[in-house]
Regions:
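Short hydrophobic/aromatic-enriched beta-strand-loop microsegments
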Residues: 42-43, 103-106, 120-128, 200-206
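Cap/insert and terminal regions of metallo-dependent hydrolase folds
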Residues: 63, 103, 109-112, 185-272
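Conserved beta-strand hairpin/beta-sheet module of binuclear metal-dependent hydrolase folds
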Residues: 16-70, 157-182
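Active-site metal-binding loops of divalent metal-dependent hydrolases
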Residues: 44-46, 85, 145-148, 182-184, ...
């Protein structure tokens, strides 16, 4: 059953730009999304090169890159969308420096862990449940989509993970749909996404081919191409690659696989700190 809750954010703006939005790639799966005066941060990780995060069961991963900015350099945030509670998606810097009053939309498991750490506005979403966000004139909906962090025999040892669909609304335009895959592998439940949402404008693909004890737990190049074939986004941006030493499938592997599949015109690549701007399509006149 699909359920929806309402989140109303305080606003001081009298008017907002509801025609365009932007995504700035901070690094790993951390992206700064802006639309209509709403500022969203995804999967916040801000440790630096050579520093480590815990990935559970006494295992650690070392960062190979630096984030494009520090938490103190971010603009004022309205909310966080967190795919799951792993150290390379919510690290010790985020826990220490993020405002504890920020709403965090995430899995039920992650919300419980965050609330224990003082993030009292953590908002759990079950799969297919949504939160409608309002700030001034801006309207958007965040829906939790299926995700599975590993193969069936290993999934019970891994945290629950969700994909996210962000739908940005404007009275004069069609909704813009942004799909963030989260740290999922391809599995049958994902087939329901294109049935419910056949028109995805942009996808952020969590890649990297992460392997823990030899087990694949995030999409590699081949699975990334499979995701493109499944959800058929108009455009896609790869993220979550080359940033940690547990990532075994480099971006170059994905680029080669995308070219071989003939999807190169749909891909847009961002370096750390670079920004992608999107525009809502105007509705056809009646």
């Amino acid at each position: 059953m699909k359920t929806e809750t309402l989140l109303i954010l305080p606003s001081k703006e009298r008017s907002a730009n509801l025609e365009t939005g932007s995504l700035q790639f901070i690094g790993n799966a951390t992206v700064l999304i802006r639309f209509g005066g709403v500022t969203i941060l995804t999967d916040p990780t801000f440790i630096h090169r050579h520093e480590r995060v815990s990935i559970g069961y006494g295992l650690h991963s070392t960062r190979l890159t630096d984030p494009a900015m520090e938490i103190g350099e971010l603009p004022p945030l309205d909310l966080v969308v967190l795919s799951h509670f792993h150290g390379d998606h919510f690290d010790q810097v985020a826990e220490r420096e993020l405002d504890k009053s920020l709403p965090i939309v995430t899995t039920r498991e992650a919300a419980t862990a965050l609330q224990r750490r003082g993030f009292r506005q953590s908002k759990p979403l079950d799969t297919w449940a949504s939160v409608a966000v309002e700030k001034g004139e801006a309207r958007l909906r965040i829906t939790a989509l299926p995700g599975r962090h590993g193969p069936p025999f290993a999934d019970l040892l891994l945290p629950d993970v969700m994909g996210s669909l962000l739908e940005f609304h404007s009275p004069q335009a069609q909704p813009f749909r942004l799909y963030i895959t989260g740290d999922t592998l391809l599995f049958d439940d994902l087939k329901e996404i294109p049935r419910r949402y056949p028109a995805i404008d942009l996808a952020l693909l969590h890649l990297g081919g992460t392997r823990v004890l030899g087990i694949l737990v995030t999409m590699d190049a081949e699975q990334g191409v499979g995701m493109m074939k499944l959800v058929r986004p108009l455009r896609a941006i790869p993220i979550h690659y080359n940033d940690y030493d547990v990532f075994k499938s480099p971006l170059t592997d994905f680029q080669q696989a995308i070219d071989a599949a003939g999807f190169q015109d749909r891909l847009h690549y961002l370096r750390h700190g670079e920004t992608y701007t999107f525009r809502l399509s105007r509705q056809a006149a009646a």
